[in-house]
């Protein structure tokens, strides 16, 4: 399971860099864990080159801890095998069960599903494996004759699964009579901070988008003993904010320079992020924390992005090999749709009522001001499995 979590985190950073190429200066927010999980559902039914490409993009067949080289990449593409695939899906089952374990302190709900044209029936074995590993049931629908009705039904299902927060996942004209198979995924999260911000401490402050432009934002404030980590190159400071129960945490990477986000994104790798955010790097400080309230909602049509990352065959009618999913010829993945929503406020992530008392440590620690008044990166992490659930870039609240 640790290896799978590493693969998901590596995929998160690769995907973030690819999305950043077409979103310079814009906010980014997505659930890497949700996207990886839903793509693994498709991967379960792939064979041959299609499977090898997906395994490469999703980092499933990368030797953990081994540095990449052209030779190792070529070898890795050729070493895909079915036993490796079975282990991956078994690990997904374990990871999903752990992350979605019922919890009184936060709520995580997924909406991952595969919809296939009914004239391309799924193998019984594939349906059984989907239920075993992912607790999911692929749906056979009538895209040919009722594509828009199916689109509306899918949107309604996603909305119900995400407490009404993810609406209209599939936009108008995104599904038509030529659609053969689509993948939809969304993740809804509601959590309460371990230490909540006091509403009366929230005031209007400037957020510096760059050296010449700023905008007024509602800036939250608290003074607490919190965990800080320092990054020497590129120069940045990080902070960990726990959610109640400490199963999840918000990690913020704040460049020291107002324009330092581009360099931070360029330099970040899974290995570096893992090192920066390790327990050994965390130090307890008396922190004067300034954090903007913000709400992000991003939608992604991931077909072109995933194709450019290397899994083009899955989207090709002539090249896709989904023989592990269906015996019908010419079955291919028409599109992958993803939508994510986050709201950071005084209570936590997404509004939630709650009160709590706490006992402050009397140990003297150094003090520091952490002023998130310019662009930064943030992650929501499941700590027990070390899995990045959400990746975000805030350029303008």
UniProtKB/Swiss-Prot annotation:
Spell out the Basic and acidic residues composition-biased ranges.
70-79
Q: Pfam family of this protein, just one?
A: Serpin
PROSITE patterns named among the record's database cross-references: SERPIN
- Extract the SMART domains matched here: SERPIN
Its GO CC terms are: cytosol; extracellular space; nucleoplasm
Compartment(s) of residence: Nucleus; Cytoplasm
Molecular function in Gene Ontology: serine-type endopeptidase inhibitor activity
Which Gene3D superfamilies did the record assign?
A: Alpha-1-antitrypsin, domain 1 (2.30.39.10), Antithrombin, subunit I, domain 2 (3.30.497.10)
Q: Which UniProt keywords apply?
A: Cytoplasm, Nucleus, Protease inhibitor, Serine protease inhibitor
Q: Where is this motif: Nuclear localization signal?
A: 74-77
The record's listing under CDD domains reads:
serpinB10_bomapin
Instruction: List the residue(s) that the UniProt entry marks as the site Reactive bond.
Output: 362-363
Q: Where are the transmembrane segments?
A: none
Question: What InterPro entries does its record include?
Answer: Serpin_CS (IPR023795), Serpin_dom (IPR023796), Serpin_fam (IPR000215), Serpin_sf (IPR036186), Serpin_sf_1 (IPR042178), Serpin_sf_2 (IPR042185)
Q: Where is this region: Disordered?
A: 62-85
Grouped into one coarse class, the protein's main location is nucleus
Q: Which family does it belong to?
A: Belongs to the serpin family. Ov-serpin subfamily.
Q: Which PANTHER family match?
A: SERINE PROTEASE INHIBITOR, SERPIN, SERPIN B10
Q: What does this protein do?
A: Protease inhibitor that may play a role in the regulation of protease activities during hematopoiesis and apoptosis induced by TNF. May regulate protease activities in the cytoplasm and in the nucleus.
Q: What is this protein called?
A: Serpin B10
Q: Which organism is it from?
A: Papio anubis
């Amino acid at each position: 399971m640790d290896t799978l979590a590493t693969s998901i985190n590596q995929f998160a950073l690769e995907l973030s860099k690819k999305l950043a190429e077409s979103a310079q200066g814009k906010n980014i927010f997505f659930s890497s864990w949700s996207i990886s999980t839903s793509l693994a559902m498709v991967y379960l039914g792939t064979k041959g080159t299609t499977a090898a490409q997906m395994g490469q993009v999703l980092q499933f067949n990368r030797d953990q801890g081994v540095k990449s080289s052209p030779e190792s990449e070529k070898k890795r593409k050729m070493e895909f095998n079915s036993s490796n695939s079975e282990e991956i899906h078994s690990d997904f089952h374990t990871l999903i069960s752990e992350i979605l374990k019922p919890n009184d302190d936060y709520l995580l709900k997924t909406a991952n599903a595969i919809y296939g044209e009914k004239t391309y029936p799924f193998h019984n074995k594939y349906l059984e494996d989907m239920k075993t590993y992912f607790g999911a049931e692929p749906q056979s629908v009538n895209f040919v004759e009722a594509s828009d009705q199916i689109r509306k039904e899918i949107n309604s299902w996603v909305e119900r699964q995400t407490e009404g927060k993810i609406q209209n996942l599939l936009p108008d004209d995104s599904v038509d009579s030529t659609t053969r198979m689509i993948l939809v995924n969304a993740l809804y999260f509601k959590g309460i901070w371990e230490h909540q911000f006091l509403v009366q401490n929230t005031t209007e402050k400037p957020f510096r988008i760059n050296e010449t432009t700023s905008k007024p934002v509602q800036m939250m404030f608290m003074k607490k003993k919190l965990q800080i980590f320092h990054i020497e190159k590129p120069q940045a400071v990080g902070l960990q904010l726990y959610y109640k129960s400490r199963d999840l945490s918000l990690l913020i990477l704040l460049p020291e320079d107002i324009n330092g986000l581009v360099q931070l994104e360029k330099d970040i790798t899974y290995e570096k992020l893992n090192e920066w955010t390790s327990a050994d790097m965390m130090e307890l400080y008396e922190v004067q924390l300034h954090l903007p309230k913000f709400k992000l909602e991003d939608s992604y049509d991931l077909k072109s992005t995933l194709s450019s990352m290397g899994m083009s065959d899955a989207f090709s009618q002539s090249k896709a090999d989904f023989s592990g999913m269906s015996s019908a010829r010419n079955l291919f993945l028409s599109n992958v749709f993803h939508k994510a929503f986050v709201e950071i406020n005084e209570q936590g992530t997404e509004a939630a009522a709650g009160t709590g008392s706490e006992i402050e440590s009397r140990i003297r620690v150094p003090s520091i001001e952490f002023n998130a008044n310019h662009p930064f990166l943030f992650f929501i992490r499941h700590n027990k499995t070390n899995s990045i659930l959400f990746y975000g870039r805030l350029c303008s609240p």
